[in-house]
């Protein structure tokens, strides 16, 4: 296998910082996705999957969207519950010495959508955060698109789960230590990993 190109090395280094997000990586007039992000992006966005070095052992799956249509595609991914990291060129390619400097300038998550175009009409867009001590759950619900904020305390896992399901969150925030709680597996069955963001304890 040939060594990775400098651009792919740069992509992988940036992607390693955002492993739970689909990385939109700016290359000229396009945002490109590579490797697993490309396969997922192609499938979820119904766009062509191609590859660099097509037909060779070291081919790299890729797909892309024009930069001026990126918002539409990001919106589709958010509606499907994905996070998107937007990586832009942060220096003029004409002035770059070597590889163009790139960095993530924004991370989009399903629970933090404020653009009414990205939201369905009449539906809440709840971001839910919670903590737990024993069998007592503290819950906070935030809809950033309307400014609505509510909080409550609930005893028992079933009551907690029922309240979370009733509010249909787009994203859930939890401390990593919840993964060691006896209720974790039951919670994960209902929400999977894509919807939950784990924060450092």
Question: Model-derived features: where do they sit?
Answer:
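Basic, polar low-complexity surface loops/patches
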Residues: 1-201
């Amino acid at each position: 296998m040939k060594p990775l190109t400098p651009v792919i090395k740069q992509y992988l280094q940036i992607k390693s910082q955002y492993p739970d997000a689909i990385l939109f990586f700016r290359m000229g007039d396009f945002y490109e996705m590579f490797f697993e992000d490309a396969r997922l992006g192609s499938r979820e966005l119904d766009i062509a999957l191609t590859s660099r070095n097509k037909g060779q052992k070291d081919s790299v799956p890729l797909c892309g969207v024009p930069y001026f249509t990126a918002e539409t595609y990001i919106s589709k991914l958010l509606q499907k519950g994905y996070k998107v990291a937007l990586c832009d060129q942060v220096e003029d390619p004409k002035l770059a010495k070597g590889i163009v400097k790139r960095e993530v300038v924004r991370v989009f998550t399903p629970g933090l959508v404020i653009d009414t175009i990205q939201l369905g009409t009449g539906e809440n867009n709840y971001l839910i955060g919670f903590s737990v001590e024993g069998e007592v759950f503290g819950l906070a619900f935030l809809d950033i698109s309307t400014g609505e904020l509510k909080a409550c305390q609930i005893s028992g896992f079933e009551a907690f789960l029922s309240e979370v399901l009733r509010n249909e969150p787009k994203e859930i925030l939890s401390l990593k230590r919840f993964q060691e709680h006896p209720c974790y597996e039951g919670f994960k069955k209902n929400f999977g990993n894509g919807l939950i963001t784990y924060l450092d304890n």
